[in-house]
Regions:
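Phosphate-binding site of ATP-dependent enzymes
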Residues: 150-228, 255-257
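Active-site nucleotide/adenylate-binding loops and adjacent lid/helix of ATP-dependent enzymes
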Residues: 43-50, 89-172, 178-179
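Residue-level detector of anion-binding/catalytic polar loops
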Residues: 80, 108, 283
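Glycine-rich phosphate/pyrophosphate-binding beta-alpha loops
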Residues: 62, 143, 194, 262-276
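ATP-binding N-terminal substructure of ATP-dependent carboxylate-amine bond-forming enzymes
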Residues: 1-87, 91-93, 97, 104, ...
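Conserved metal-phosphate-binding beta-hairpin within the catalytic cores
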Residues: 175, 184-186, 234-267, 277
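Short beta-strands and strand-loop turn motifs
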Residues: 80-85, 111, 137, 258
Length: 283
């Protein structure tokens, strides 16, 4: 009955979770009504309620719902739930581990390295990487804390800002690839941001991006290759139900790369996975 204490430091993905439905209770009012004024997003009696249900629908984003803790708790208690199991969530939440698994499984992915709190002052010229670069928290969701760095000043500023994000003790650094983005669910959805990166704002603001399914700018053969790579990625990360792999096709050479895996992709009417499912014939 103290499950809520395990999840007392939610990250930025929480804002998206609150936006899943307009019919959810007022969480601010709910917290104020608690005798202990607990700020937890998971309150008392959650376990009892979930045990009463035939199945629990997972609609949590960011580490609070995708790092595998909640799934492991439910597994131990015999509670059925939607989405991947605890192992799949744990593996995919860590972007560096995901890269390593992709490489051993034949899934094309950008090379990358990481810095921890102890090594965050490492100079750019010591990394063996060249600008432009992408800097992002090793374990976070919704593209929160993702920075594209074109100058050394950008790089050091991004490192500083990334480590300022709650619960961030490691950041991933990888080459920036300019290209077209595709979400693989398995049918592909092409993502065309209105302005620059498909970041937090463009993902969740109306009109932030155009989403085309099936893609019209990609030939059938390349679509098939990306879908097969997506299947290998799902299998390698133990994504045994539904999930979404994000790919980019390089403008420079036409090669495609898997950027990361989303264990619990958005499931609103405007989200990418439901659009892909509809294109595949699922309503």
């Amino acid at each position: 009955d103290k499950l809520e204490e395990i999840f007392d430091r939610p990250d930025g993905g929480l804002e998206i979770s609150k936006g899943i439905s307009t019919s959810v209770p007022d969480l601010g009012a709910l917290r104020k009504s608690r005798p202990d004024q607990s700020p937890s997003e998971i309150g008392p009696n959650v376990i009892e309620l979930c045990q009463m249900a035939d199945i629990t629908f997972m609609a949590l984003h960011g580490s609070i719902g995708e790092n595998g803790k909640l799934q492991a708790t439910f597994d131990n208690l015999g509670i059925k739930y939607t989405g991947p199991n605890s192992l799949g969530c744990t593996l995919s939440m860590n972007k560096l581990v995901t890269k390593q698994i992709f490489k051993t499984s034949g899934v094309p992915t950008p090379r990358g390295t990481s810095l921890t709190v102890k090594t965050k002052d490492t100079r750019l010229d010591e990394l063996g990487y060249y600008l432009p670069l992408v800097v992002k928290p090793c374990s976070n969701g919704s593209s929160i804390g993702v920075y594209i760095c074109h100058t050394e000043e950008d790089y050091y500023d991004a490192i500083h800002k990334s480590f300022d994000i709650d619960n961030t003790d490691e950041v991933v650094i990888e080459p920036f690839i300019k290209g077209r983005e595709f979400a693989c669910g398995i049918p592909l959805v092409e993502i065309v941001p209105k302005d620059g990166l498909f970041d937090y704002a463009n993902k969740y603001q109306a009109g932030g991006a155009s989403e085309i399914c099936p893609p019209v700018s990609l030939d059938a053969e390349t679509q098939e290759l990306i879908q097969r790579a997506g299947e290998r990625a799902f299998e390698a990360l133990r994504m045994d139900v539904y999930s979404r792999a994000d790919f980019i096709v390089s403008d420079a050479d036409g090669e495609f790369y898997c950027l990361e895996m989303n264990a619990l992709p958005g499931m609103t009417a405007a989200s990418l996975l439901p659009k892909a499912a509809k294109a595949a014939g699922y309503e």
